[in-house]
Amino acid sequence: MRAAADEIGARYIVADASDPDSFAAAIGPLETIDLVVHAAGALGGTYARKQTFEQWRAIISANLDSCFVLTSAALPKMRAGSRFIFISSSASYEPMMARTAYSASKAGMNAFARALALEVDRDGIAVHIVTPGPVETEMLQDVPFEMQAIQVSDVADAVAWLDTVDPSVDLPEIRLSAVRRGPYARVPVVPDEVHRRAASAEKS
């Protein structure tokens, strides 16, 4: 993070987006906030019948509670022309088996963002949702099947473009996914979990 901040001449702050007190204290020195990108989160989880309440709460806290924590701390510092961008997931529309908490948390994020938009539009504050399909990150390595995925840079490009949209344009959501057919089809990603299961099957 330090290297990335140095490269673009930015300052970074480490804060827990699921802890109201520590997060509010971390951004306290900031006088105004023009753009908030909620990209904190966790995948994890398991089948509902196997999941403990502690596992459920960990995912909900990271992905959904953090929406409230971040918004409640940042909103007083935002003015007309500023905006929120929430990074959601296609799991909010197409729930993932064995990812009940994750799917529920992302659906909740979308509902939170839409309700927030109804509240802050009169203040000239925009709210956008970026909903990507699979993204090639470390979190994807625990998925037990291969798939086409987009890159983190694809999501970042969408976020950067959204910040250029005129405030008079209402753009609630952008959905991103990898092209699966034709000359621009993405090469399938084979997560580590696929290799682990294949190796285990060979041994047995």
PLM segments and residue spans:
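Active-site helix of classical SDR
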Residues: 71, 105
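Residue(s) in the substrate-gating loop at a strand-loop-helix junction
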Residues: 89
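Active-site loop immediately N-terminal to the catalytic Tyr-X3-Lys motif
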Residues: 49, 96-100
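Conserved NAD(P)H cofactor-binding loop of Rossmann-fold oxidoreductase domains
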Residues: 40-45
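Substrate-binding pocket helix/loop in short-chain dehydrogenase/reductase
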Residues: 47-48, 52-60
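C-terminal helical subdomain
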Residues: 129, 144-189
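Active-site-adjacent segment of SDR/Rossmann-fold oxidoreductases
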Residues: 94, 115-125
